[in-house]
């Protein structure tokens, strides 16, 4: 089992904390976000971790020396692209996972989570497994006056996700919340690469051009083709760091 952390982002809403460091290096409760992630992954037994940097990638790479991260990729167009493009900057690492028959966990770099969450994801044996928070509203109520302003749809049937990432207009459209942590089996990863490379570069995906496609748009496209996205349900014990106010939010277990 391997993992990749997508850490190319600038984090403009966290300025001035991101003036001299990338978003993932901002501290939450006296520890950098990426430290929480690497520690959670390693404590769950994942030792081969790749990172994709972008904004101030040299600062990040130097910081990661203490973890002996061997696989560091750069999204040089971090300011013009989105998460899917960042992910495929590490295609060589994906191919390595396939060759060595290692499943791959994908993590956003602005979320704080712990070993128990990673372990649940590891335990899911499906081709595509996505962590979702059933208790999302507790966290969103702390973060926003109106949780629906930021929350996205997530609908499930028999434990499998059929829709995610759309603008939610009502609470009954949100059975859980996508957190930015998921896993591809090494067998399915071959399909994922082929699927990505066959996508039309000239159309919009949820009103975004190809290079700015949201990860949720890409996952939704995979769901519509393969219908294989297993929901790995958690109840809190994580948070997203997107705004200065998020740094004051207490994680509920």
UniProtKB/Swiss-Prot annotation:
GO biological process: capsule polysaccharide biosynthetic process
EC code(s) of this entry: 2.7.7.103
Keyword rRNA processing assigned: no
Gene3D superfamilies found in the cross-reference section: Spore Coat Polysaccharide Biosynthesis Protein SpsA, Chain A
Phenotype seen when the gene is deleted: Mutant does not express the MeOPN CPS modification.
Single GO molecular function: cytidylyltransferase activity
Record keywords: Capsule biogenesis/degradation, Nucleotidyltransferase, Transferase
A Pfam family this chain is assigned to: NTP_transferase
Highest rank taxon of the organism: Bacteria
Coiled-coil zones: none
Pathway: Capsule biogenesis; capsule polysaccharide biosynthesis
Biotechnology annotation for this entry: This enzyme is able to catalyze reactions that produce natural compounds CDP-ethanolamine, CDP-1-glycerol and CDP-2-glycerol, two of which are not available commercially. It can also produce CDP-serine, CDP-serinol and CDP-3-D-glycerate which may be potential inhibitors or mechanistic probes for enzymes that use CDP-glycerol. The labeled nucleotides, such as beta-[(18)O4]-CDP, generated with this enzyme can be used to probe the details of enzyme-catalyzed reactions using positional isotope exchange (PIX) and molecular isotope exchange (MIX) techniques.
The keyword Nucleotidyltransferase is assigned to this record: yes
Catalytically driven reaction(s): N(5)-phospho-L-glutamine + CTP + H(+) = N(5)-(cytidine 5'-diphosphoramidyl)-L-glutamine + diphosphate
Protein role: Involved in the biosynthesis of the O-methyl phosphoramidate (MeOPN) group found on the capsular polysaccharide (CPS) of C.jejuni. Catalyzes the formation of CDP-L-glutamine from CTP and L-glutamine phosphate. In the presence of MnCTP, catalyzes the displacement of pyrophosphate from CTP using phosphoramidate, methyl phosphate, methyl phosphonate, phosphate, arsenate, ethanolamine phosphate, (R/S)-glycerol-1-phosphate, glycerol-2-phosphate, serinol phosphate, L-serine phosphate and 3-phospho-D-glycerate as substrate in addition to L-glutamine phosphate.
Identification of the protein by name: CTP:phosphoglutamine cytidylyltransferase
């Amino acid at each position: 089992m391997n993992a990749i952390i997508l850490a190319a982002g600038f984090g403009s809403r966290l300025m001035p904390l991101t003036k001299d460091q990338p978003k993932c290096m901002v501290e939450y409760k006296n520890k950098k976000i990426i430290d929480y992630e690497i520690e959670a992954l390693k404590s769950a037994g994942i030792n081969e971790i790749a990172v994709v940097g972008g904004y101030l990638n040299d600062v990040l790479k130097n910081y990661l020396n203490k973890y002996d991260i061997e696989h560091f990729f750069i999204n040089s167009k971090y300011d013009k692209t989105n998460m899917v493009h960042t992910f495929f900057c590490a295609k060589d690492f994906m191919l390595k996972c396939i060759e060595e028959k290692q499943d791959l966990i994908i993590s956003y770099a602005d979320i704080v989570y712990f070993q128990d969450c990673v372990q649940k994801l590891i335990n899911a044996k499906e081709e595509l497994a996505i962590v979702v928070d059933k208790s999302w509203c507790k966290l969103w109520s702390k973060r926003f006056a109106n949780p629906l302003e930021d929350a996205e749809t997530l609908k499930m049937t028999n434990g499998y996700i059929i829709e995610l990432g759309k603008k939610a207009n009502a609470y009954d459209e949100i059975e859980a919340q996508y957190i930015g942590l998921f896993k591809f089996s090494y067998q399915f990863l071959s399909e994922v690469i082929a699927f990505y490379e066959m996508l039309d570069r000239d159309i919009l995906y949820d009103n975004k051009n190809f290079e700015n496609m949201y990860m949720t748009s890409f996952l939704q496209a995979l769901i519509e083709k393969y219908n294989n996205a297993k929901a790995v349900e958690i109840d809190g014990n994580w948070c997203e760091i997107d705004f200065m106010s998020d740094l004051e939010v207490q994680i509920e277990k």
